[in-house]
Amino acid sequence: MPNKRIFYASHAVSVDGTVVHGAQSVGINTNFNLEQVFQLGRLAIYDNIATDPDVEITINKILDGRPTIWKLATTGGSLVQRANDQSTIVLAVDDETQDFIAAPHTAAITMTGCYISSLNYTFPVDGNLTEEIVFVGSHKAVGGTVGTPNADPLDRVLRRQNVAISECTLPAMVITRKLSQISISADLGREKMFSLGQLAPFHRFVNFPLEITVSFDVISDGENQNILAGPTFNETNVECAGINILKEPIVIKLCDSDGDIAYTFNLGSGCSLQSVSYSGGDTGGGNVTETYTYITYNDLTITG
């Protein structure tokens, strides 16, 4: 009997032959990047040219002790070492009446030569700790196979108690504060390289320097009056006077239920405070939140 719908149990995704365990969502967006050509003497369009078709794949997963999508898709240590790695992404769909996905599939799509375009990690006080990776590529074809996801996580799904605060290296502004969320993000800013004789780009390079952002949401209690709005500064006309924004190390560690470190996010020692925001506390009953956003460049190592 043909499928009437696709829901979470009837589709799955793999990266380089390994099924993504704990995947929460997957989306595919195809853009043919049409360019219009017109001609003198006629109002109607002359031609619609597909200049360089793109496929974008977004995968979101919970962190559960198993390898990150970042690790499945790339090899090496630092961000620079992993920048040119390409992956094969397969999305498979099965019968909606099955308990789990398994080959042979009802349908499948394979996307080869995919590069990581952006990454985002979110560690909230409410909900699960998550990873979201966006891939971009130029090849999409029918077919492919995805393995059956495991029934259980490797340990437990990580939540707020699994942020190992005592093991983290945090900036001075937030080290003693009550944190409600940590977010790490980077847009790799891929640019295409073309050559005569072929439609698809032969390379998508990372446009260094690459900015990495980490933000800390803090529950404001009003006791830290001197840092409520971040470092203070006064407009001055004194020669040679300026604002000294220090560079600080940031390392975020997540632990499993046994207390062992499952994931480490090392942003190096060159993180600088970029902005501070103060919001909330309105008449709707919400609390005031301070957000401290730090930036660094070209330095991000993820293990786990």
Protein language model features and the residues they cover:
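Signature of extracytoplasmic/envelope-associated structural regions
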Residues: M1-G304
